[in-house]
Regions:
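A short, flexible loop at the N-terminus of ABC-type nucleotide-binding domains that lies
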Residues: 4-17, 22-33, 82-85, 99
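Hydrophobic anchor residue at the start of the ABC signature
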Residues: 168
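Helix-to-loop junction immediately C-terminal to a conserved catalytic motif
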Residues: 62
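Conserved ABC ATPase "signature" region
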Residues: 125-150
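The feature captures the beta-strand-to-loop junction immediately N-terminal to the Walker
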Residues: 47-49
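Conserved ABC transporter NBD signature motif
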Residues: 70-81, 88-89
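Conserved ABC ATPase signature
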Residues: 154-158, 162
Length: 173
């Protein structure tokens, strides 16, 4: 018997949004009263017209933005950067910004390894020495997106599509 299927939907959620609204200023509401559960182990696509709030919704979901009203919970916890469990939960949320956010003059591999930083809790060792298992994972992901052979190439030397795949690989870290 699969016990997971007998649990209430909210028990399976990694992200819960309850009556969330968001705005960038006091005048213009971008999102209004959004409620949703993002279930663990599932993939979602957010589709909408330009300016409809897709990026804003993603920023709310991964803790990059605080809602104007309502609450966003991660594994049933309110955002708290001092809480170790919260930081672990939020580090599992991949996000590919529209501008990609690649670090110029660094290699493809280094850009992908940036995705491991929230888990490592040690930003001081940024490019010095990543654990061997993180480097192996990065190579596996680069292989998955067809870029492992270019792992040492500088990102500014890549095509637009290759840069997008580097950003996807980083989100998968």
């Amino acid at each position: 018997m699969n016990m997971e299927n007998t649990l209430p939907i909210s028990t399976l959620s990694i992200i819960q949004m309850r009556d969330v609204s968001a705005s960038y200023d006091s005048e213009n509401l971008i999102l209004k009263n959004i409620s949703m559960n993002v279930k663990r182990g599932t993939n979602y696509a957010i589709v909408g017209a330009s300016g409809s709030g897709k990026s804003t919704l993603l920023k709310l979901m991964n803790g990059m933005m605080i809602p104007s009203s309502g609450v966003v919970l991660y594994n049933y916890q309110k955002p708290d950067l001092k809480n170790k469990e919260y930081k672990k939960s939020i580090a599992k949320i991949g996000y590919i910004p529209q501008t990609l956010g690649l670090v110029k003059n660094t290699s493809v591999l280094e850009n992908v390894l940036i995705g491991a930083l929230p888990r490592l809790n040690n930003l001081k060792s940024f490019f010095k020495m990543f654990p061997k298992e993180e480097i192996e994972k990065a190579h596996d992901i680069l292989d998955l997106v067809g870029l492992d052979a270019k792992s040492e190439r500088k990102v500014h030397m890549l095509s637009g599509g290759e840069k997008r795949r580097v950003a996807i690989a980083r989100a998968l870290m």
